[in-house]
């Protein structure tokens, strides 16, 4: 039995990699330690429903703030991923079989937490013929049935090894926001995201809009991996060409010495510059700060996103 709390067992595919020193974080990266009544209650509900969260599995720096407010990003289809991205702290290996009761448990937890907005993500499941598309759809429908007032945001894998039709299965379940992260600039894909294809991910986002223009599309990248500013701005252009509505940009933080090294810590002023550039390119919503993550403040951001589209359409 693997102990996923031990890095060597959590990431066996990274054992051959040399150790990379983990640099000291600058003052603008510091966060408070998790704790408090709200945090404990969120933790309790997750455990009672036997649910996995990306907040814990990926070591998100914002877990204390989000959980104290009763917000958690639920990760479906297990805690073991079939990919081995060099930036990611999710365990890699052979996943367990799908849990048919998981969609219902997610819906129960959403209701129990009283969420106005929920973010649901997953590991990559290249072992499944549909990549887990039907499981995503079932989870969306279960939440809709139990909490019809809750808006639903999904953060999906790329379905790279699946038939193109599987994307329709997810879109037909009508999430409010479809998020798929490009993660980094295309030049870094061979090292950072070797199991993925940049232009496939772009096309997936574009296809969502073609299938259902009412669904908001969202994507994000990390900076501090070794990219240059012109490359980041080219990614912005590529996303806008794919009609992506919402862009997130955050600082890459190295989970362990075996992971991709932090090239540098991008300053808050540089993030402000990226945000300004992105709005200038036509994104409806941009979140670009050192601690920005895909689901950070997602509920508040969704309200702003919807207001921005209404204003653009003259409905405000």
Swiss-Prot record:
Q: Which Pfam families does the UniProt entry name for this protein? A: LIAS_N, Radical_SAM
Q: Which reaction does it catalyse?
A: [[Fe-S] cluster scaffold protein carrying a second [4Fe-4S](2+) cluster] + N(6)-octanoyl-L-lysyl-[protein] + 2 oxidized [2Fe-2S]-[ferredoxin] + 2 S-adenosyl-L-methionine + 4 H(+) = [[Fe-S] cluster scaffold protein] + N(6)-[(R)-dihydrolipoyl]-L-lysyl-[protein] + 4 Fe(3+) + 2 hydrogen sulfide + 2 5'-deoxyadenosine + 2 L-methionine + 2 reduced [2Fe-2S]-[ferredoxin]
Instruction: Please name the GO terms that the record assigns under molecular function.
Output: 4 iron, 4 sulfur cluster binding; lipoate synthase activity; metal ion binding
Give the E.C. number(s): 2.8.1.8
Keywords noted in UniProt: 4Fe-4S, Cytoplasm, Iron, Iron-sulfur, Metal-binding, S-adenosyl-L-methionine, Transferase
Q: Which SUPFAM superfamilies does this one have?
A: Radical SAM enzymes
Cofactor: how bound: Binds 2 [4Fe-4S] clusters per subunit. One cluster is coordinated with 3 cysteines and an exchangeable S-adenosyl-L-methionine.
- Pathway annotation: Protein modification; protein lipoylation via endogenous pathway; protein N(6)-(lipoyl)lysine from octanoyl-[acyl-carrier-protein]: step 2/2
Taken from the UniProt entry, a GO cellular component term is: cytoplasm
* Sequence intervals crossing the membrane: none
Instruction: Tell me yes or no: is Cell membrane among this UniProt entry's keywords.
Output: no
Q: What name appears for this protein in its UniProt entry?
A: Lipoyl synthase
Q: Which organism is it from?
A: Ruegeria sp. (strain TM1040) (Silicibacter sp.)
């Amino acid at each position: 039995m693997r102990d996923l709390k031990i890095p060597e067992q959590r990431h066996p595919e990274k054992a051959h990699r040399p150790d990379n020193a983990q640099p000291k974080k600058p003052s603008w990266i510091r966060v408070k330690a998790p704790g408090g009544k709200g945090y404990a209650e969120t933790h309790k509900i997750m455990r009672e429903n036997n649910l996995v969260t990306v907040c814990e599995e990926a070591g998100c720096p914002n877990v204390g703030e989000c959980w104290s407010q009763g917000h958690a990003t639920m990760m479906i289809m297990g805690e073991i991923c079939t990919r081995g991205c060099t930036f990611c702290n999710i365990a890699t290996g052979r996943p367990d079989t799908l849990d048919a009761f998981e969609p219902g448990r997610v819906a129960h937890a959403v209701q129990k937490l009283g969420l106005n907005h929920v973010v649901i993500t997953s590991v990559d499941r290249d072992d499944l013929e549909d990549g887990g598309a039907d499981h995503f759809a079932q989870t969306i429908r279960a939440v809709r049935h139990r909490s019809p007032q809750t808006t639903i945001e999904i953060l999906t894998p790329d379905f790279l090894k699946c038939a193109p039709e599987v994307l329709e299965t997810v879109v037909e379940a009508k999430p409010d926001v479809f998020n798929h992260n490009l993660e980094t600039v295309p030049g870094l894909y061979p090292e950072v995201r070797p199991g993925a294809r940049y232009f496939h991910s772009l096309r997936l986002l574009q296809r969502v809009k073609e299938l259902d223009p009412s669904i908001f599309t969202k994507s994000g990248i990390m900076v501090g991996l070794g990219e240059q500013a012109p490359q980041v701005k080219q990614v912005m252009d590529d996303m806008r060409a794919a009609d992506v509505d919402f862009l997130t940009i955050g600082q890459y933080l190295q989970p362990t010495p075996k992971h991709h090294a932090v090239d540098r810590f991008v300053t808050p002023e540089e993030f402000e510059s990226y945000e300004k550039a992105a709005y200038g390119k036509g994104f409806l919503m941009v979140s670009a700060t050192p601690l920005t993550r895909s689901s950070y403040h997602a509920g508040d951001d969704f309200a702003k996103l919807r207001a921005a589209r209404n204003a653009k359409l003259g409905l405000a």
